[in-house]
Amino acid sequence: MQNNNTAISQLIEAGKWVSQKEWIPATGGNFSARTESGFVITASGQDKGKLTSEQFLQLDLQGKPLAGTKKRSAETQLHLSLYQLIPEAQCVLHTHSVAATVLSQITKSHKLDLTGYEMQKALTGFTSHLETLSIPIFNNDQDIDHLSLLVSDHHLHTPIEHGVLIRGHGLYAVGRNIDEVRRHLEVLEFLFSCELERLKITGIQASNNNK
């Protein structure tokens, strides 16, 4: 388990990378990482491409503040829930890309199924493009406690592996370390972009593929 300073440094670098990819406009999204004392997370309303160490909060795994004076994001609770649900998860990156936002909005099902893409094999646990990747989709909800409960209920019968989509909102990518999360994030964003382009070309509604 890494210390707070190391985790913050890695998240600052991740913020620059994600910002350059244009997956997190304005001050949206939030990043977190597990630490020896709990986890660190970006404060509310921060430009993720220009993060400094003062823009992070340190919390324990019950959500109790340990350090930091800036405003806590309401979405902190969802990060906390993901860490509690997935003990091996060490990092969560929440982004607001166009592809993730639009696909989650037009997909009427509560999951986005993707198959046939070679890049699926870059996700932990996948060995073939013939396998089906299912990313759960949850309706956006300003009541984060309620949203977290829905995510928890889903995880009980269908464990969350690579991330979750929030409808019309964005992606929460998870992994066993920050490098794995960055890989998962990049792969998922690539797949979302491919699927969105495919739907534009074929004219097939996303809901038809995810009944």
From Swiss-Prot:
Keywords: Amino-acid biosynthesis, Lyase, Metal-binding, Methionine biosynthesis, Zinc. It catalyses: 5-(methylsulfanyl)-D-ribulose 1-phosphate = 5-methylsulfanyl-2,3-dioxopentyl phosphate + H2O. One of its GO terms (molecular function) is zinc ion binding. Its EC number is 4.2.1.109. The keyword Transmembrane does not apply. It comes from Pseudoalteromonas translucida (strain TAC 125). Binds 1 zinc ion per subunit. Pathway: Amino-acid biosynthesis; L-methionine biosynthesis via salvage pathway; L-methionine from S-methyl-5-thio-alpha-D-ribose 1-phosphate: step 2/6. The gene is mtnB. It is an enzyme of class 4 (lyase). InterPro entries: Aldolase_II/adducin_N, Aldolase_II/adducin_N_sf, MethylthioRu-1-P_deHdtase_MtnB. Zn(2+) binds at residues 94, 96. GO terms for biological process: L-methionine salvage from methylthioadenosine; monosaccharide metabolic process. GO terms for cellular component: cytoplasm. Belongs to the aldolase class II family. MtnB subfamily. Its cofactor is Zn(2+). This is Methylthioribulose-1-phosphate dehydratase. Catalyzes the dehydration of methylthioribulose-1-phosphate (MTRu-1-P) into 2,3-diketo-5-methylthiopentyl-1-phosphate (DK-MTP-1-P).
